[in-house]
């Protein structure tokens, strides 16, 4: 078995594009191998800032022979049909075809045997196609070439079983020299193709090892690159950076602030990582830590360091792409100089922002359009203020807390017009909280402003303080109601206004804080302030949307989506905490033996009723059972059990004891099983039959009073 090694060597690939490009290239090559009938065992891709390297192992040196059968026309068909068959099958005479009786007549069959060729012969076109089809978010031309690529492509290494794959990639044409004054006597001829030939050479680190390397295999390639100061494996580079940064932090008595996203990006910026530590001038340390961290991370790709108490330290980690003779002193000094300029701007904005009260800044929100159909950001802030106070009342907050909710909601968007947020949009909300503290607003008001966007995702922290919870809920519910009102709902993968995230945020805020709040009245209250909203329609659509989001949120916890459907099927289930209590109890019920068997009996009853109700054109639900026509002991026992269950079930449901309610339903298993074993529902006597169908309807209705059992799968 042979090995295919391909390296695309180029100028620096943007770090954010590398992993996706590597996976795309692996897929394009392996898909083409499979389409060509070339088997392989495994494919592995690596990326660095200057190269995409793919190795495919376990490829046969020769392609397998192919035997193909092609059915032709019936024996005795017209000559024209026979000639068409011969041409399509590559035969010269009909005697070369076989005659077979298919049971539907005798037909001609062509047996075409194609000997497998050398695999290397199929590779040039395969590699060319994979390179040309590689998608880039952005691409460019360079020089006079027609070929587009993310950055100028310098070389293509292509080896199969140690041999260079013949051919190359045409990237453009070289124009012939212009005519001389003597006419075309010196004309060199037609334009010639510019081709990057496949070869067995690459280069190491741009500065440390710029010489050409000749390789013979993937192992040789990896080893020679390492010797030339290139660590090919991205994960290894990440681990080296992480270990080096942690060690550097520990040497300073500090702790590295975890930042997986930045680690991923920095691993795509260096081929030979060298970790260095720099300092932040003390004059900048009164700027909020989030602003400093964002500036270092976004603009400079520095890792922040913290004290053991979690406070930002005046030190940072920078990762260079090579060691230096001075131990990195010049590199650190240069980075500190650049950072000083960056943070000078941040400090200027911070000082300016502190000078103006948030209430004064709030008026400038009238100049920011939230959405062309939904008014300005000031109008949105007013909606959030009114809704947050309503939510706070629902949660039972006292008068003082209600006022703090009102202030926090009123000011939560004011930092959008600050200089710091204009420079660093990532700190919106957080910056407002810092300004509020500096301007002596109550601590829980400042915290609510800082946290009103939270949670930002499934793993983000959920606010727990009641003031913050009320404002965060109002922010998200206003967003959801407003965009649903103008029919900007998520569709498929399209969710430009992050409404799925907002709904998940509402779910987490309510569930993780155990809040007893009905969503529909809140949706209705929010809809009143949105000119385009039709309250009932928006509320119903949103509740269905929340049901879908709840399924997604709980799927990771192993909760079955059909159980959520069954509880939502009751209608009006907009108290999420109560709903989840029902779901938990229902999950325990269907997992028990009695519950599973009763579910089977429910389906049997429901199926009989569906057929008979359709046939009779009536519903048997709600009709009284004639006790005098309960002829068999089993039907009398079932009727008595249903009466007892109904009497005991209502107080359990009122007390929200859903586990007790499910336990009560489980006791119906015996009478229901006995009924189906001994009683004929469709009796010849029409009155008796109707009475028994009403008894089945009681089974269905009793269970459906706890959950819509028709939606439970399995």
From Swiss-Prot:
The keyword Ligase applies. InterPro entries: DALR_anticod-bd (IPR008909), Gly-tRNA-synth_bsu (IPR015944), Gly-tRNA-synth_heterodimer (IPR006194). It is an enzyme of class 6 (ligase). Its EC number is 6.1.1.14. It is found in: Cytoplasm. One of its GO terms (biological process) is glycyl-tRNA aminoacylation. Keywords: Aminoacyl-tRNA synthetase, ATP-binding, Cytoplasm, Ligase, Nucleotide-binding, Protein biosynthesis. One of its GO terms (molecular function) is arginine-tRNA ligase activity. The keyword tRNA-binding does not apply. GO terms for cellular component: cytosol. Its main location: cytoplasm. It catalyses: tRNA(Gly) + glycine + ATP = glycyl-tRNA(Gly) + AMP + diphosphate. Pfam families: DALR_1, tRNA_synt_2f. HAMAP family: Gly_tRNA_synth_beta. Belongs to the class-II aminoacyl-tRNA synthetase family. Tetramer of two alpha and two beta subunits. This is Glycine--tRNA ligase beta subunit. It comes from Rhodospirillum centenum (strain ATCC 51521 / SW).
